[in-house]
Amino acid sequence: MRIGVDKNQLSGSHATSNAPKHRQRPDEVASLEPLRLPYGDYILIDDDVQSVLSTKLEPRKKDLIGHIKRSIDTKKDIPELWMDVTSDHERFKAELIKAKQDGAEFIVLIEDASVECLEDVFFYHRPEVVRSRFVRNKAGRLPAYIKVEHKQREIKGESLYRCMQTISTRYGVRFEFCTRRTAGKRIMELLNDG
């Protein structure tokens, strides 16, 4: 089994957070191949996708459009999903529209142990939190680092649940849930299940 992984999942901060997930698969069962995917994070490299890959030296995102049957987009937790359906909505919506126009099944896999099914999202709640961190003082004066505070907005499960229902109905998206420990195995199951 060959799995295409979006190159962004293998670089930067994603690389360290996704390393445990990528180690969950036995190497003799599945190999990961970095690709530029038009939507989602993981795809199954079947004969149709392989035909595109073998004709191009470095395939671009648009080369794979029309050849992907199922795509999995992973979210590390509920707050990341909340960000995608609120502040980062236009980018997320564009991905969903591309997948729907392409005729691909789009699955959002949320890696959060506090939620097991879509109905559990309704009861999810995270209060508003004020976080602080130290950043380098760009003015060049002392102190070298200054404390910066920012608010993380409250997440109401009821609102998120309604957004997810709308997305599911409008774009044909399927939401799946798992823990971080089982994410790699679950990705393989979802890609094989078709």
Model-identified regions with their sequence ranges:
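Conserved catalytic cores of phosphodiester-cleaving nucleases, focusing on short active-site segments
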Residues: R70-K76
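Non-catalytic C-terminal interaction segments of nucleic acid-processing enzymes
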Residues: M1-H67, E80-G194
